[in-house]
Amino acid sequence: MKLAYWMYAGPAHLGTLRVASSFKNVHAIMHAPLGDDYFNVMRSMLERERDFTPVTASIVDRHVLARGSQEKVVDNITRKEKEERPDLIVLTPTCTSSILQEDLQNFVNRALTLKDSHADVLLADVNHYRVNEFQAADRTLEQIVRFYIEKAKRENFDFSKNQKISANILGVFTLGFHNMHDCRELKRLLTDLGIEINEIIPEGGNVTNLRNLPKAHFNIVPYREVGLMTAMYLKNEFQMPYISTTPMGILNTAQFIREIETLLKALTQNLSNSSNCEKFNISFAEEAAKILEKDFQKYISEQSRFVSQAAWFSRSIDCQNLTGKRAVVFGDATHAASMTKILSCEMGIRVVCSGTYCKHDADWFREQVRGFCDEILITEDHSQVGDMISRLEPAAIFGTQMERHVGKRLDIPCGVISAPVHIQNFPLGYRPFLGYEGTNQIADLVYNSFTLGMEDHLLEIFNGHDTKQILPKIQFEDGSLEWSKDALEELSRIPGFVRGKVKRNVEKFAQQNNKPFITLELMFAAKEAVNA
């Protein structure tokens, strides 16, 4: 546990609460002291939803510490069951309340013996000291799915496959980066291919429908952070294949579609080789044949040329102005890796550093971005990211809300491509990052993130209606250095898009030569030293 004023991935209980509050008619009870109960406020502020956050805090106070938590926790479970009538109640401690080392599973068992209802009660099986928000969310989703699958098995539920080819989408949940928009785009893409959606979990799903997950023919995991454990469990239990390629960018989306085609061919081949000629198998083979009759490559070509504008835009003169420009990418493993490939392969932008805060997925991330960037950074420390950006001085940053703050401080534009984000990245309008419509959004974001230069320079030359002075914008930050009036005037004549870099180079030269007062002559000397 460490004290920090900024964390990329939150504590484990946030992941559990995000999964629980994504399902319909599921209530979460958080066993926590005051100060850990900020999830309700955070979700109500950020997520654009009409419903209240279904989370109740069972506060650990001095009375609880004096006589134990069992009575209070059990009372909260039974009370919420009567008030909300949920299908499932999820109990979770926080890293703080875990210090008490209480037997919460015993509390759950006690509540189950006292209450008389249909609601299930589940203790989130998460180690709050060893995992972060994403790992806990992944584990909690898998635990809930496993619970209801095992329950269906005991009831001898029929897990036979759907007549029509269908897929589950796993890992779309509340407070995700553009998750709702991405889900809509994925549904559109699958509909175009003739594939039905079986279940989408956890966002908007019912836990009572989790028993239907094995009826689909394959699973889709659009984000590595959440959903992989569930997909692996379903594969081991029901031999369900899954696709974990994120369809972000033209190349990755094409690869995603080709993987679906390959998967359907493999399923059809397995059925044709099987000696079992049931009516269902024949029906499935016919459905698969209809889908495979479509020219997948033709679909990819048409979507890339006519639906996605990014392909031709990347070859236009506007985008060619960005060729060779330097950029830094940082975010979660899924979005940072995909964005690195898009910038490098599709837009010709040089990625000087690509990084992620998902340390648990570091090996996969390195494998994905190796060869597409100059440096790789794996860290949860925002100060290291800020130092790296300051050292490399890129033309643009693509990162989280924290990199946006760093960019403002260093006067470097930043496009937000990954959680954690603030409310402006929970748009009401349709803004997916996945699929072919997502390529248009990404192309706009990339192009608009770079400072074009001449616009700012011309505004400074001609001023327009702006009567503000320019000089106060370029005051030095280091109190040990002082600029002469002539040097400041010369600095103001330098175009805005390179002025910051020139200023930093001059100050660095002055510090190296122990010159506390920067004159016009020192500026010219610094210029000669840099050019040399």
UniProtKB/Swiss-Prot annotation:
Designated gene of the protein: chlB
Catalytic activity as recorded in UniProt: chlorophyllide a + oxidized 2[4Fe-4S]-[ferredoxin] + 2 ADP + 2 phosphate = protochlorophyllide a + reduced 2[4Fe-4S]-[ferredoxin] + 2 ATP + 2 H2O
CDD domains: Pchlide_reductase_B
EC number assigned by the record: 1.3.7.7
Function statement: Component of the dark-operative protochlorophyllide reductase (DPOR) that uses Mg-ATP and reduced ferredoxin to reduce ring D of protochlorophyllide (Pchlide) to form chlorophyllide a (Chlide). This reaction is light-independent. The NB-protein (ChlN-ChlB) is the catalytic component of the complex.
Pfam family, one: PCP_red
Statement: the UniProt record of this protein carries the keyword Cell division: no
Annotated residues for binding of [4Fe-4S] cluster: 36
Coiled coil feature spans: none
Residues engaged in binding substrate: 453-454
Enzyme class: oxidoreductase
Subcellular location: Plastid, Chloroplast
GO molecular function, one term: oxidoreductase activity, acting on iron-sulfur proteins as donors
GO annotation, biological process: light-independent chlorophyll biosynthetic process; photosynthesis, dark reaction
Cofactor: [4Fe-4S] cluster
Keyword list, A-Z: 4Fe-4S, ATP-binding, Chlorophyll biosynthesis, Chloroplast, Iron, Iron-sulfur, Metal-binding, Nucleotide-binding, Oxidoreductase, Photosynthesis, Plastid
Protein name: Light-independent protochlorophyllide reductase subunit B
Family note: Belongs to the ChlB/BchB/BchZ family.
SUPFAM superfamilies on file: Helical backbone' metal receptor
Pathway it works in: Porphyrin-containing compound metabolism; chlorophyll biosynthesis (light-independent)
Co-factor: note: Binds 1 [4Fe-4S] cluster per heterodimer. The cluster is bound at the heterodimer interface by residues from both subunits.
Phylogenetic classification of the source organism: Eukaryota, Viridiplantae, Chlorophyta, core chlorophytes, Chlorophyceae
Location of the active site: 318
Assembly and interaction partners: Protochlorophyllide reductase is composed of three subunits; ChlL, ChlN and ChlB. Forms a heterotetramer of two ChlB and two ChlN subunits.
Organism annotation: Tetradesmus obliquus
